Amino acid sequence: MEHGYTALWRRFQKALKQRNQLLRHGRMDEDSLRAWTAELIPLSEQITDFRKQYLADLTKQVLAVAGRFDGLGVLELEYYQGWDDQLSLEEVLAGDRTRDIATGKTNHGAHKADIRINVDGVAAAERLSRGQVKLLVYALKLAQG
């Protein structure tokens, strides 16, 4: 799986780089922008699928490891895919077109993904002490093997 993900990520990075270069130009080639956008969308979706599966597996391990530490509370790992999950990436990028051109970059996609960690329903950064954050980091590292 790791090799497949790495190859996929490289293809995604190439498409993102090409799309962003087009967005930065004052006069852009619309056909090229459409082509790189069409390449970027399925790659983003495939990367998202890989990551969701990885996080689901990791979450099980993290919960098992974190359960050995006192005082961490109820952990929840949430995956943010880099765009509103109620919309397709195609819809989001179409809606972002003006903003993307103005900023010269692609504002949504797999490159904007994040993992949000909550403890007892509150962001871990707001809830945990520095010592508890260290325990959480240890749990994450141990869970990854």
Regions found by a protein language model. Give the residues of each.
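Flexible interhelical turns and helix-capping residues at alpha-helix boundaries
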Residues: 2-5, 23-26, 47, 51
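Extended, charged alpha-helical "arm/stalk" segments used for dimerization and assembly
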Residues: 1-22
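Amphipathic alpha-helical coiled-coil segments with heptad-repeat character
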Residues: 5, 9, 26, 30-33
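Conserved NTPase motor "head" modules and their coupling/switch loops across ABC/AAA+ ATPases, GTPases
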Residues: 28-145
